[in-house]
A protein has these predicted regions:
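Acidic, polar-rich N-terminal leader regions of halophilic archaeal proteins
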Residues: 1-137
């Protein structure tokens, strides 16, 4: 079993703090993307809304989440010991699982995969943000 990512908040306050900290970075990322696209200041004002910057912040937060990567057996062992309610997405008859738990919410999400680790991690992080953190941050 291994870990991908580094952020595993211990509390709702820690999650909110991290999310808020990504605000300025999200603004810079969006501004630089707009520049790279060759849009002028007028187009920036018209097209870049607070929702665009918020989406960038959501992605930055989600992509920083720590995710456990392991076999189905390792996941089932972990699941037997956790107090979290686990939401599992994906096919049941595969060899590997990625998961993220937020014990302070008593929730965890997991995604199964066979070969595409990178895709599974991305899917899981989006699921974790949507199912766990959206209401917290």
């Amino acid at each position: 079993m291994e870990t991908a990512g580094q952020f595993a908040p211990a509390s709702a306050a820690e999650a909110r703090e991290r999310y808020e900290a990504f605000g300025p970075t999200a603004q810079v990322v969006v501004k630089e993307v707009v520049k790279a696209m060759g849009l002028d200041a007028e187009a920036y004002e018209e097209r870049v809304t607070s929702e665009v910057v918020e989406t960038a912040r959501d992605v930055l937060f989600a992509e920083s989440l720590a995710v456990q990567v392991g076999s189905m057996t390792e996941f089932e062992e972990w699941r037997a010991d956790t107090d979290c309610e686990v939401t599992l997405v994906g096919a049941e008859n595969v060899d590997n699982v990625v998961w993220h738990a937020a014990p302070f919410t008593e929730q965890a999400v997991a995604a199964t995969f066979q070969d595409e680790l990178r895709a599974a991690v991305g899917t899981l992080r989006r699921q974790a943000f949507g199912r766990i953190y959206r209401e917290v941050v």
